[in-house]
Amino acid sequence: KEKYATPRRTKIIDAILNYDIEETIQKETVLITVTLQGYIKRGSLKTVKIQKRGGKGKTGITTRNEDSVVQTLSVNTHTSVLFFSTEGLVYKVKAWKIPEGSASSKGKSLFNILPLKNHQSISSIMPFPENDEDSSKYQIVFATSQGKVRKNSLEDFSSINTSGKIAMKLDNNDKIIGVKIWKDCLLYTSPSPR
């Protein structure tokens, strides 16, 4: 010790690591699947294969009785996904936060991911552009069960807290049945004119 008794040259300090967990998530294209009974899963697009003519196909998701896939969405893991509930609320979740599932799994309940109430369900999901400037270019259209239609800028949904945001105020017994991106032309029909 006396022979090599030089003071330490490096300094050891306690520091809090300041990093965003999203920086550690690899960017890849994933497929998000939502079922009628409210199950959701994320799977890698690498596992999806194009079948040849006369092929038997491959199971993409295992569903329970009377359950079926209602929406699929191909997005990047860093893309935010908007979830529009039937009660008029919208939620925003990053795609990498959606639990990953194998091709044979049924997925996780949406109640585990979103703060939904018992009577709520998700009517539509859509990707939110990665650049907030791009969101001003898009319009979205809401349609309700009582035949009401409303148009909003997608930019209105750029900041949403974890408990959600009111996307559309609804009358009693009215529910959102669909939300779509509106481009140039919109055609909606009714069996009886109003």
Residue ranges and their predicted role:
Residues K1-M126, D132-S135:
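Hydrophobic core positions in small helical hairpin nucleic-acid-binding modules
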Residues L36-Q37, S85-E87, T144-S153, S190:
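Extracellular/lumenal glycan-associated surfaces
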Residues Y39-R42, V90-Y91, K148-N152, S158-T162:
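Short loop/beta submotifs within extracellular cysteine-rich repeat domains
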Residues S80-F83, V141-A143, I177:
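Polybasic, glycine- and aromatic-enriched phosphate-binding surface used to engage nucleic acids
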Residues F128-K148:
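Alpha-helical transmembrane segments and their helix-helix packing motifs
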Residues A167-N173, V179-I181:
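RNA/tRNA-interacting regions in translation and RNA-turnover enzymes
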Residues Y188-R194:
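Conserved small/polar residues in nucleotide/adenosyl-binding loops
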